C-alpha cells in the first residue's frame, strides 16, 4: 500500500501506482534475451576501455541479493567487479553482516568498505530527523560512495540492485530507460544532493565529502553510467 502523500509518487486513473503498473508489464512482456542484448551493448561501451582497471562497481551489503548480483556479474557476464559497501561500524553492523562481507571476500571478490566518521554521522542523523527525513544523511553517504569511488578508480559502469521508481514508486528517479540509474540524485531522500542543510551542523567542509554526490557534469566528464539490475 503506497499513500499519495509520499514524495514523488505517481498513480494512474485507477489508483494503481507506477511500481505496480510496471510489475504487471514485466510479468506480461518480460524478455530476458532482449535485456541481455541491451546489457551487452552497455558493457561493450563502458567496460572494455581500460584493462588496467576494474570493469565495474557493484554496491553490496553482503546480504543474499548483493551476493547473487556479485556472482552473476562475475560468473555470468565475465566481468571483474569491485564491490563497494558503505557501512557504519561498529554500531550499525551485525555479526551476520560482517560474516556476509567475509563470505564475499572468501569467494574471491575485491571488496572496499567505506564508512564516514561516526561522530559526523550521528550529528547529521539527528538533524535529518529534526528536518523530517531521518534517512537523508545515511542515504546521501550510501548513494554517494559508489559514483565517488567510480570516478577515483576510473570505472564507468556502476551496478545497483533495484530501481526506486520501479520498486517503490519514486518516479523522479526514472529516465527514458528503466535500467538507467543516473537520475538517482532526484530521489525523495537525496533531494538533488544539496548539502546546504548541513551548514551550522558540520563546520569542516572535508567532513561533508562522504555525503557529496558527484554532479551531473562530473558524471558526464567521467562517463559514469549507473544500471539497475533488479
What are these regions (language model features)?
Residues 1-57, 72-230:
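Nucleotide-activated chemistry modules centered on ATP-dependent adenylation/adenylyltransferase
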Residues 68-69:
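Hydrophobic positions on the alpha1 helix immediately C-terminal to the Walker A/P-loop
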Amino acid at each position: 500500500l503506497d499513500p499519495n502523500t509520499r514524495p514523488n509518487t505517481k498513480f494512474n486513473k485507477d489508483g494503481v501506482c507506477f511500481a505496480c503498473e510496471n510489475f504487471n508489464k514485466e510479468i506480461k512482456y518480460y524478455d530476458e534475451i532482449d535485456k541481455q542484448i541491451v546489457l551487452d551493448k552497455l558493457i561493450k561501451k563502458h567496460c572494455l576501455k581500460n584493462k588496467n582497471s576494474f570493469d565495474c562497481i557493484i554496491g553490496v551489503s553482503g546480504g543474499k541479493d548483493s551476493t547473487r548480483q556479485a556472482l552473476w556479474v562475475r560468473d555470468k557476464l565475465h566481468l571483474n567487479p569491485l564491490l563497494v559497501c558503505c557501512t557504519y561500524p561498529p554500531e550499525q553492523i551485525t555479526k551476520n553482516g560482517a560474516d556476509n562481507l567475509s563470505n564475499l571476500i572468501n569467494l574471491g571478490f575485491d571488496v572496499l568498505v567505506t564508512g564516514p566518521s561516526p561522530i559526523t554521522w550521528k550529528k547529521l542523523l539527528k538533524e535529518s530527523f529534526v528536518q523530517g527525513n531521518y534517512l537523508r544523511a545515511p542515504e546521501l553517504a550510501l548513494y554517494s560512495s559508489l559514483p565517488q569511488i567510480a570516478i577515483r578508480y576510473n570505472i564507468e559502469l556502476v551496478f545497483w540492485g533495484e530501481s526506486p521508481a520501479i520498486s517503490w514508486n519514486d518516479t523522479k528517479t526514472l529516465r527514458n530507460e528503466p535500467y538507467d540509474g543516473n537520475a538517482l540524485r532526484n530521489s525523495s531522500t537525496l533531494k538533488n544532493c544539496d548539502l546546504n542543510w548541513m551548514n551550522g551542523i558540520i563546520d569542516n567542509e572535508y567532513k561533508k565529502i562522504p555525503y557529496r554526490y558527484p554532479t551531473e557534469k562530473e558524471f558526464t566528464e567521467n562517463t559514469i553510467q549507473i544500471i539497475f539490475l533488479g
